[in-house]
Amino acid sequence: MNNIITNKIINKEEKLKYLIAIPCVNRTERNALNIIDKTFEGFEKAGMFESEIDFDIILFESGSIDKSYLNFIEEYKTKYKKNIFIYESNKKENANTNTHRMFLYIRKVPKNYYDFIVWMDDDVFVCQKFMENADAWIKKYANFSFFSSLYVPYRTYFINGSLNVQHADMSNFYGTCCTIFKPEVVNLPIQNWFWQHFELFNFNPDARFRDCIRKKFTSLKKICVSYPSLVQHMNIGSSIYNNKNVNKGHKCNNFVGVDVDPKFYENIK
């Protein structure tokens, strides 16, 4: 655990490399609406593809029959020369098996290739200069928490003297719209992902991730989260619950906004 929670601030000048990992599926095959193209439009509007922050994007495709919903990705790869990859499955996955497959992939990546994983959903909004702001926050605070989140729909607590970070009870964590962790963290959920209790009560990926860590490290009570949130859940239907209903699901109430740059890269010292 000492390699994960180092309690050390990362120098602002140090160059980190991130993997943005996004599980996805052709939602029309799950009685929901495809929205990932709008997510990428938001990424573009936020300046992500022109950012100097070093990151790759991997889409973990859930074994959809029709994968043409991802054809638009080629436009971004051609226009911006960015590393955007699609990791396909040869069988139909659900949210839990696909996330487990994502963790297995991350575990096989050479050690120290990525500094942090940014686990996101395929239906999110992001703030302006998202990568610059995320990079600044991660360098200052991510080493003080087993995992962190830049999307915070649950209760948090102020930390004296800190403006852009708050504490949350780990037991309250849910929503993987923007979860931050070091690659070696995946070893824990991989070990217990299909625990009988999770299967019996049909836990979703966020709850399994959280409780795999809590099960191993019972002394861990808090996580560090951003304030305000840099990411918002679109909340436009669900491929997990097979519905097209708008505004049925979780959402945070402290999202900074798609047109706002919170300037963490200037304000976080």
Residue ranges with predicted function:
Residues 2-3, 22-24, 30-39, 193-269:
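C-terminal catalytic/acceptor-binding lobe
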Residues 125-202, 206, 211:
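Conserved catalytic core of nucleotide-sugar-dependent glycosyltransferases
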Residues 38-53:
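Short, acidic, metal-binding catalytic loop of nucleotide-sugar glycosyltransferases
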Residues 16-22, 43, 55-59:
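Hydrophobic targeting segments
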Residues 25-28, 64-65, 92-94, 123-125, ...:
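Short, solvent-exposed loop/turn segments at secondary-structure junctions
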Residues 28-36, 69, 91-99, 126, ...:
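Phosphate/oxyanion-binding active-site loops and adjacent basic polyanion-contact surfaces
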Residues 114-125:
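Short beta-strand-to-loop acidic/aromatic patch adjacent to the donor-nucleotide binding site
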Residues 63-114:
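Active-site-proximal specificity loops/subdomain of glycosyltransferases
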